[in-house]
Amino acid sequence: MTPSASPAKAREPLELPWDPERLPPFPAIALKALNLMSGTDSSLIDLCNLIRSDAAFSVAVLRVANSPLVAFSKNVTSVLQASMLLGFQRLRSVVIAFGLKAYVREAFTPLMQSCWRHSVACAILAERAARWSFLDKDFAYTAGIFHDIGKVALATTMPKAYTRVVDRNSELVRESVVQPADLLASERELCGIDHCEAGRLLLAAWDLPPALINVVACHHEQKALASGTSTLISPSCEMSELLGFAAPGAKPLRRYEQILADFPEMARSRFPVDMEELASEIAKEIQAIESA
């Protein structure tokens, strides 16, 4: 009689277990830019000089500066000129978003593209809400960009397993029964770790600030986040899904006005009444960076 398979062997791993050591490093220019932004001596010129040291980032900044999104821009030919036109805040946004795009470039599949667009949309929304609420705009944008970095990590190192995760959750979306916890459970079952924990480990390996790591680890647990800027990421993530920038396997579960209620009062009054107007604004900003 053939012995039955033990529970431990019932599911053979599709690929090697997830290991952050097998991931490529995040672009050094973007990480250095983050350090500049978090330091007391950071300045527009510091950031400009950093960008000029890398050809790819220089081209990205010039393309954004010459895009229709930037008013009065025409024939911007130098990074310094682009920096003065864009300003520190917007320049920082371009560097971080382009850094994430460069990070996933080798595997820029439709899945990765959707994850990237979702992250940028979340970052833009969080930054706006922070600005309107007099909170930390830099932190809000950075947290928005990195909140789903764990998905990128899992999809990069375990593409077959993560495709199964997405397929399973997409089926739940079609049946209109998906919940945020379903994705995390599927990730843990098929990959051995969920994207929140994977993101936490990855950002810790990159030696990023503890406050940022905590947001990435807890962005699906609003109550676990401290007050202030950190609380903007969860509604920004959900809002980006509602506006049409959902990552594969995700679906917005609430209406526009319900999500708005989770933002600070000062931010709620500044968001457009028309959801389509907001979606169009975000799409234009993403397109400007995407084409860089």
What name fits each language-model region?
Residues M1-L14, E238, Q258-A292:
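Terminal helices and disordered tails flanking the catalytic cores of nucleotide-processing hydrolases
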Residues M1-S170, V177-Y256:
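Conserved alpha-helical "signature site"
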